Amino acid sequence: MPSIVRNHGPHNKILLSALLLALFGWVPLASAAVAVPMDSTGPYRTVSHPENAPSGVDAGVGPSEWTHAYANPAHNAAFPVPDDAPEWIRNGVSWLFPEARAWPLANPPFGSKTYGAAEASVTQTQFYGNALGPSVVDGVVYAESDDMFAYAVNAKTGKLIWRASPVGNNLMGNPLVIGNTVYLSAGSVAFNFANVLRYAHNPSASARGLNVSFNGIYALNRSNGKLLWYFATPGETMATPAYDNNTLFIADGAGNAFGINATTGKQVWKTHVGGMDNMSSVTAYRHNIYFAMAIKPYLYCLNESNGHIVWKGTIPGASNTGIGDVSPAAADGVVVLDATTKPQANKKAMFSNVIRAFDAKTGAVLWTRNMGSGGKIPAFKGGVPMIHNNIVYVGNPVASTYQAYELKTGKLLWTWHVPTKVAAGAGRSAPTYYKGLLYITTGQYIFVVNPATGKELHQHHIGGQFGIESPVIVGGTVYLTNSWDWIMAIPLKTISHGS
């Protein structure tokens, strides 16, 4: 990529880069390389093994692009393959890939003796391993990790193609893969003391991740992981962007939403709505985008082209962080969101999870349901919904249940109680529907549930811990990541037959 400035020495390039970053949130690679050199022999260098990339028919396995967190607006990451697909993907493959900070799957959370198992597990989930599941495109598994690396791994062999760490920050999203580019989102759950004081003074003007690290979107070369451009955001961008019409859409921890040119990394529009986006990934649907903000607890619908607010809605009584955690799902003209609500007055710390459906075009409330109550849960306050065939499948972490609702009417179809051997707070991840079965990752297990009745059919123990990582199913293989910093492939028949 050519520099946008003439060569007047490195000092002037550094100053111009700083000015561009401050004014526009964008730095061209030529200038960025001068200001931030990368040690070619250091531990955070980009490592590339092109010989491990898939070739031939193997390079066409799976979807050809990945545009959203959980694959698509409906959050169902399931991809059948044709009968003439390679045998390995039809029958399933099995491998384990340890990421940079891989922790033994049989071990309790790091630091359990000091912090206690519950607190250590939350800390490991937020700072150590994978926050979301992988993306699978054209025979390659892509993953972001809190270990500060992004990975590209051969979907058949489990061998590393490249590993890159473009910034010293947590990478908590689903990599988007479009054309020859991989897009990462960088941001941490952390607050520095200035952020805490800002919240104490004026909660509605608070910002998460401000001045904590270099937040924003990083575009990498899909073939080798090299940095192409960086778009800076003031607040954290833990959530995953959405892609549509050559534009990336992201919301940050400082109350902003952005439209970004996916080719150049330049800002198309910016809208400040206030509040904080935690892990609420953007959904692009029918020329609008949808995301939720905490503190000022609203679900927003913005016009894709200009960022103008079309409508906003809320969930009554949503907790401070709850409504900004969950990614909205959209299908058949309906947008669905849920959140943990504040405890009722004079009640003993009992929380509820509430789900609400909105008309995607107008924001009119279609229905609202209380999913059930339970004790206070740590961290992520809600369950990520998934929509398939006019049914919403969604978890409730305060009650450790999953439920199915009719999309248009909100009629409750069934409730499945996660087994008690799974840690409290189960029910955060989006289920995956594939060939008449529902696959759910929670605790140390992946479960198979009948989507018509809610009856548990099988369970498969994996170890480690699943938070909001959902299964990605391609043909006969389930691809997973987890908080213990592993990428893995498991044959579908191993899980669906029980073990």
From Swiss-Prot:
InterPro entries given in the database record: PQQ_b-propeller_rpt, PQQ_rpt_dom, Quinoprotein_ADH-like_sf, WD40/YVTN_repeat-like_dom_sf
EC number: 3.12.1.-
Record's subcellular location: Cell membrane
Signal peptide limits: 1-32
MF (Gene Ontology): hydrolase activity
Protein name as catalogued: Tetrathionate hydrolase
Catalytic function, reaction form: tetrathionate + H2O = sulfur + thiosulfate + sulfate + H(+)
First-tier enzyme category under EC: hydrolase
Phylogenetic lineage: Bacteria, Pseudomonadati, Pseudomonadota, Acidithiobacillia, Acidithiobacillales
Keywords attached to this entry: Cell membrane, Hydrolase, Membrane, Signal
Entry keyword Signal: yes
UniProt pH dependence: Optimum pH is 3.0.
Major subcellular site: membrane
Temperature dependence: Optimum temperature is 60 degrees Celsius.
Highest taxon in the source lineage: Bacteria
A GO cellular component entry from the record: plasma membrane
Assembly and interaction partners: Homodimer.
Role according to the record: Catalyzes the hydrolysis of tetrathionate to generate elemental sulfur, thiosulfate and sulfate.
Similarity annotation: Belongs to the tetrathionate hydrolase family.
